[in-house]
């Protein structure tokens, strides 16, 4: 069975990049798209921006 955290992630779209596209930009883009939250998954250096409801 899948972890609840894995099932929560719905839309991953942009590569996170320190100094260019970080958690703040990811969060802003997710809110603009109508999601409740957004974060770089699995981390800020190698992750992608994933939005959750």
UniProtKB/Swiss-Prot annotation:
Disulfide bonds join 12-51, 16-40, 26-49, 30-50. The keyword Plastid does not apply. One of its GO terms (biological process) is killing of cells of another organism. The keyword Disulfide bond applies. Keywords: Antimicrobial, Disulfide bond, Fungicide, Plant defense. Pfam families: Defensin (PF24552). Belongs to the DEFL family. This is Putative defensin-like protein 53.
């Amino acid at each position: 069975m899948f972890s609840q955290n894995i099932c929560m992630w719905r839309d991953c779209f942009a590569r996170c990049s320190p100094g260019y596209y970080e958690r703040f930009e990811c969060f802003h883009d997710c809110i603009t798209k109508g999601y409740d939250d957004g974060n770089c998954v699995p981390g800020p250096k190698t992750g992608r921006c994933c939005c959750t409801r």
